[in-house]
């Protein structure tokens, strides 16, 4: 398995720190609004990386944080007249709903920055003691960038470059700094902002220290993979390396993975630019699996341009897989239940060749576009087998191959058995009758039964209305 490492700018064979185990940290969202589909790309991409690692037999400790204290969160809280934690907790919950809709599995741990303040103070104290950080008169603590000789190794920039083009990203409160490049580890409180007591001042942590500390706590000083969007390479991930390696005295992450942007009209999607769609916007129009399929239709390091045409193409492609799976299921239900024939064993051996193609694509830096192409080759092969009579075991084996590979991509391709409209109406009529008979317990049971099957009821003056969830 080879991974493109941003640190070395080349594909490298993946060798875990501990055989059979993977320690992986993915930078999560700042929770001040609903996530947009640009935020969803790294969630889907690195969830797929995790799934493939597990498919290959690795035990993956997958950590993805929520940044729950930030200027944007505070601004939103002021606008609504509520505490900042009300905003962050609201949008953490909403983010988890969106992730679930996209079949992004929960991380092993989802740490929140505000719950790890003690660890941040401890790392800052260590950095000061080692000479990598210093406190200014007002209590602001800065990282001494020039003290870390490898600074710039991830973004492949030297300090002279940073003095120029990237300087604006680093400079703030320059009057107190020893050097314009130094960045904040701890900042003093402002009126109306959340704060924590510290040895330096009442305040809150800088953004970069949060991930260094959460990664250390839940994964250790050294990790296998650190991942996120390419916009995080500098300054965020560069600063994480400086903090973690200076504090811990060990290499931080062995492999750095970064996904390219999701664009609209060839411009990066962002809330600040106003050119974005939320995940909610899209799943209101499309099956969430269509969005996931679309995200995986290109290599994660390639920019991806969002359009209605590409979403329709993704929907059609996904339907082809689902139709094949449904057809195989139907054939299995109506086939003879006997052992595989020799001919069927040979056919399944041919099918295994497409599984090998899938693995080959994923082993090459998680090339999901080619991996999905291998799934379609398997679908085409299954369709060519459809004209002949085969055993139940054969059809089930073919179906399992397609569903297994689809599941590695996080794609749900088996349709849930849906109630026919007539069945729904019949249950609603029964519920109405039980309510008239004042058998409210049974009426509630029917409502719950329908809800479990994805049917939502709404009692109105005009009668009962229903919809599929």
Protein language model features and the residues they cover:
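The substrate-binding groove and active-site-proximal loops of carbohydrate-active enzymes
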Residues: 78-84, 108-114, 229
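Short phosphate-binding/catalytic loops that engage adenosine nucleotides
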Residues: 58, 132, 455
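Structural preference for alpha-helix termini/caps and helix-kink/transition segments
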Residues: 268, 275-469
């Amino acid at each position: 398995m080879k991974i493109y490492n941003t640190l070395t700018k080349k594909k490298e064979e993946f060798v875990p720190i501990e055989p059979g185990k993977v320690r992986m940290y993915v930078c999560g969202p700042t929770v001040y609004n609903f996530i947009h589909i640009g935020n969803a790309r790294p969630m889907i991409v690195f969830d797929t990386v995790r799934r493939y690692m597990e498919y290959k037999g690795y035990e993956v400790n997958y950590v993805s944080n929520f940044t729950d204290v930030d200027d944007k969160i505070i601004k939103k809280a002021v606008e609504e007249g509520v505490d900042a934690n009300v905003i962050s907790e609201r949008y953490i919950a909403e983010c988890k709903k969106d992730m679930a809709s996209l079949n992004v599995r929960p991380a092993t741990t989802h740490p929140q920055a505000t719950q790890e303040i003690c660890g941040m103070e401890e790392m800052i104290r260590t950095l000061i003691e080692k000479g990598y950080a210093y406190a200014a008169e007002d209590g602001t603590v800065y990282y001494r960038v020039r003290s870390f000789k490898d600074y710039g190794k991830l973004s492949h920039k030297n300090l002279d470059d940073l003095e120029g083009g990237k300087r604006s990203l680093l400079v703030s409160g320059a009057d107190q700094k020893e050097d314009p490049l130094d960045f904040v580890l701890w900042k003093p409180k402002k009126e109306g902002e959340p704060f924590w007591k510290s040895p330096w001042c009442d305040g809150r942590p800088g953004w970069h220290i949060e991930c260094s500390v959460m990664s250390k706590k839940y994964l250790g000083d050294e990790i296998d993979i650190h991942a996120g969007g390419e916009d995080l390479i500098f300054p965020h991930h560069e600063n994480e390396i400086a903090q973690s390696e200076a504090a811990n005295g060990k290499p931080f992450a062995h492999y750095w993975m970064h996904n390219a942007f999701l664009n609209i009209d060839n411009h990066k999607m962002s809330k600040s630019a106003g050119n974005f769609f939320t995940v909610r916007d899209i799943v209101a129009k499309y099956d969430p699996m269509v969005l996931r399929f679309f995200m995986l239709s290109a290599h994660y390091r390639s920019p991806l341009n969002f359009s209605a045409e590409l979403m329709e193409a993704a929907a059609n492609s996904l339907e082809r897989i689902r139709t094949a799976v449904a057809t195989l299921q139907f054939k299995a239900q109506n086939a003879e239940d006997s052992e595989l024939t020799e001919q069927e064993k040979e056919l399944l051996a041919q099918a295994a060749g497409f599984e090998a193609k899938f693995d080959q694509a994923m082993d090459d830096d998680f090339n999901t576009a080619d991996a999905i192409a291998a799934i379609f080759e398997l679908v085409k092969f299954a369709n060519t087998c459809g004209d002949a009579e085969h055993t139940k075991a054969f059809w089930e084996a073919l179906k399992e191959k397609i569903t297994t590979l689809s599941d590695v991509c996080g794609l749900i391709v088996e349709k849930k058995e849906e109630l026919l409209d007539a069945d729904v109406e019949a249950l609603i009529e029964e519920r109405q009758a039980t309510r008239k008979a004042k058998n409210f317990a049974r009426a509630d049971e029917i409502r719950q039964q329908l809800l479990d099957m994805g049917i939502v009821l709404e009692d109105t003056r005009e009668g009962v209305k229903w919809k599929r969830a």
